[in-house]
Amino acid sequence: MEFKATELRLGLPGITEEEEKKIIHGSSVVKNNNKRQLPQTSEESVSISKVTNDEHIVESSSAAPPAKAKIVGWPPIRSYRKNSLHEADVGGIFVKVSMDGAPYLRKIDLRVYGGYSELLKALETMFKLTIGEYSEREGYKGSEYAPTYEDKDGDWMLVGDVPWDMFVTSCKRLRIMKGTEAKGLGCGV
């Protein structure tokens, strides 16, 4: 067994010392290509590979690197929220409606209704109850339920206490309470 076959040295496998010196001094194509070459078996294949590698180097240096593709996906959260808030202004104002004793919630659009009377009729048909007529003195007369709403400040008020436009802008959610629970919210309830 030869000593050269079992010798441990630093360098690329399968390359002789002469080839390694060529690589270090820059006379080899391998340095320009940044890829390891397999050892060639014949002179003819070596010359063919050098020609193709030289052509490849010329082509790659003259061509511009490929442009990065634009990443397509969700927009940043801030833009998404801005757009959704803008669309909400154009669309409806949806609020949740709950009723004491009912195991479900509903959601309604306040912009669909033109005033309190239309809203109350819709709530009566939605929950199959009678709310009665609202008066500032007596509240909701003739009903065991009183419609209330939570405003921007978190206060619960009777539906009908403020003008309709102010109600639409300040209402966060609606709740149809029992009349006994709504006693402290308005006059004569």
UniProtKB/Swiss-Prot annotation:
Transmembrane segments: none annotated. Keywords: Auxin signaling pathway, Nucleus, Phosphoprotein, Repressor, Transcription, Transcription regulation. A motif (EAR-like (transcriptional repression)) lies at residues 8-12. Belongs to the Aux/IAA family. It is found in: Nucleus. Homodimers and heterodimers. This is Auxin-induced protein IAA4. Its main location: nucleus. Phosphorylated by phytochrome A in vitro. GO terms for cellular component: nucleus. Residues 92-179 form the PB1 domain. Pfam families: AUX_IAA. One of its GO terms (biological process) is regulation of DNA-templated transcription. Induction: By auxin. Aux/IAA proteins are short-lived transcriptional factors that function as repressors of early auxin response genes at low auxin concentrations. Repression is thought to result from the interaction with auxin response factors (ARFs), proteins that bind to the auxin-responsive promoter element (AuxRE). Formation of heterodimers with ARF proteins may alter their ability to modulate early auxin response genes expression. InterPro entries: AUX/IAA_dom (IPR033389), AUX_IAA (IPR003311), PB1-like (IPR053793).
